[in-house]
Amino acid sequence: METRVACITIIVENAESVEKMNSLLHDAAQYIIGRMGIPYREKGINIISIAIDAPQDLTSELSGKIGRLEGVTVKTTYANH
């Protein structure tokens, strides 16, 4: 199946959602190229960037599931190729 490279940017404002988010990311681990998390303690949020190379349907589904978590905002950007 054809894959597309994408960057999923996640902002977590509710720490209680982190465990479920990590479980969703673990399920997609075979497609994840890399992950960077930045705790922004002054604002009480976490900023996470995920580089992924997966079928577009899987990336979209993952992004949607993460975005439905309470206190979590997500945006996905796809490479042109």
Model-identified regions with their sequence ranges:
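Long, contiguous binding/interaction regions
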Residues: 1-81
